[in-house]
């Protein structure tokens, strides 16, 4: 067993926007260690966002992440041989991680031609409180609400 928990690694801000949140989404988009490609995709998507919304892409992106962040999630807890889905509050760093993961995941599932367009459209949709990532957050909250009776089993 481990002696203690591995320390959280600090994320360096990205070179263009000087923002750690942008670096984190780049790391989520990245596949097979191709960070340069992930950066090209995201910065291209940001250019597209700027063209379509006439707003700063960073503000649109931050609004999108804020809209997708879940407040509650379900954790499975085994008590007396049965599994209960217990709603628990989500810590701030996990909220951000889930939001970024959901945005990237649902962007990949979209039907636009390029990944650049998929990411741009998913971010725009999320900033307008629509899209699949927002639906995922709402479904998570609905499930938590439905299992509210087990909230006293938190640990």
Curated annotation (Swiss-Prot):
Q: Could you tell me the keywords of this UniProt record?
A: Ribonucleoprotein, Ribosomal protein, RNA-binding, rRNA-binding, tRNA-binding
Q: Which domain of life is it from?
A: Bacteria
Q: Which SUPFAM superfamilies match?
A: Ribosomal protein S7
One record GO biological process: translation
Query: Does the record's keyword annotation contain Zinc-finger?
Result: no
What GO CC terms are in its UniProt record? small ribosomal subunit
PROSITE patterns listed in its UniProt record? RIBOSOMAL_S7 (PS00052)
Please provide, alphabetically and separated by semicolons, the GO molecular function terms listed in this UniProt record: rRNA binding; structural constituent of ribosome; tRNA binding
Record-stated family: Belongs to the universal ribosomal protein uS7 family.
Q: Give the record's subunit note.
A: Part of the 30S ribosomal subunit. Contacts proteins S9 and S11.
Chain's role: One of the primary rRNA binding proteins, it binds directly to 16S rRNA where it nucleates assembly of the head domain of the 30S subunit. Is located at the subunit interface close to the decoding center, probably blocks exit of the E-site tRNA.
The name of this protein is: Small ribosomal subunit protein uS7
Q: What species is given as this protein's source?
A: Mycoplasma pneumoniae (strain ATCC 29342 / M129 / Subtype 1) (Mycoplasmoides pneumoniae)
Give the encoding gene's name. rpsG
